[in-house]
């Protein structure tokens, strides 16, 4: 019988530690295994938010035996996001502000209504503003007796999570899953043919979700190809800037595709809640008073679309940096057998790039891509950031 922790890929030590904590929490014994605040870190695709959600399910599990059965009502509702005592915070904008955090703290102060614990799971805790982080810190320092905080962030670097907040949490570091582990999941859980699973796993950068998308979504494969075409376009400066514009446009199209259906559904639901189409007494005044609510929805949807577009663009930049990294590794005599290439299916392109660009140029190219990612984090307009990166790539190639 599959338990919730079966969703983790290549994280055996994490599963053991979280299971021990859930057992201690259930038994109610004083133990160093359980605490009120946890910080899950790991690179994109490592499954840090999945691990946190699985732990939340294990804490709420009502079945006998090892917590996290995956079958009881508490486990299934937690994993589905419908458990009344598990609050999952997924930032839709570029940051988590003070107002939202105060609302979360109010929820955290309540006693659980149906479950064993009141669990607050904050994904992308690195998006907390400084003020919002301080609001959270106050309750983390003195947590309610039956409340558990689960924070997720890329790393323990002070730029990702405040030092003080980090010091109040038990740290759970996740590792990048191996290509073999990802391929096995795609074969056994998704029923993919071995060749398809192994290819998707090898080019996913250790990201399980991305491997699944690349294997099943033609548009995802097209976006990857389009992003990597920028590297060859750099040899022709006029084409390079056009390729950079295509990169931004592709990210915007992906965001629109992801958001459009949800945005329309939210608008319809809000219109219904506000009495759209009503003819009864008070309908006209209700419609007049809805302008502010509609404007707030539009603001949140715009912020969510911006974040989705930035995330899509960042994934493309990681692919571009990976191709330069592969060429640099090859230039220094490394082969795919000693170091895992990011793009093993592009061996000819990697070889050509290594032959055409000196090591210094490859290194400067990687730095240009990383500088672009940092600029996007600082809210520089994507087209400006990409144009500056392309200029840096052209200069690096000519060096």
Which residues does each PLM region occupy?
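Charged, glycine-rich active-site and insertion segments that engage polyanionic ligands
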Residues: 1-57, 74-77, 147, 153-316, ...
